[in-house]
Amino acid sequence: MIPGEYVLGSTPVVINAGRDAIDVVVVNTGDRPVQVGSHYHFAEANAALAFDRAAAYGRRLDIPAGTAARFEPGDSKTVRLIELAGSREVYGLSNAVNGTLDAGNARQEAKTEAK
């Protein structure tokens, strides 16, 4: 094996199979490109991105880990979002949640408009 070499199996690997997914239209209303990483709580993404933040609550991009989606100024694109899994805890980012996504009235208390 060569360092960095990929050894792939013969069967396809489907990422995020069986996850509840939604499609959301996103428009970059800003004057600079915006990138959002694969595991970022999408509802807290850059304020220049216009989309349904309530629908995006508790979700992330349905893309391979370690990658990102890029939104150029003025661009409109549809992205697929899946639910965050695991403990469903979000800390930091734009400080809208800072805890468990599903706790009591966390959705109502979260500032779903990015700062």
From Swiss-Prot:
It catalyses: urea + 2 H2O + H(+) = hydrogencarbonate + 2 NH4(+). Its EC number is 3.5.1.5. It is an enzyme of class 3 (hydrolase). GO terms for molecular function: urease activity. Pathway: Nitrogen metabolism; urea degradation; CO(2) and NH(3) from urea (urease route): step 1/1. Heterotrimer of UreA (gamma), UreB (beta) and UreC (alpha) subunits. Three heterotrimers associate to form the active enzyme. This is Urease subunit beta. It comes from Arthrobacter sp. (strain FB24).
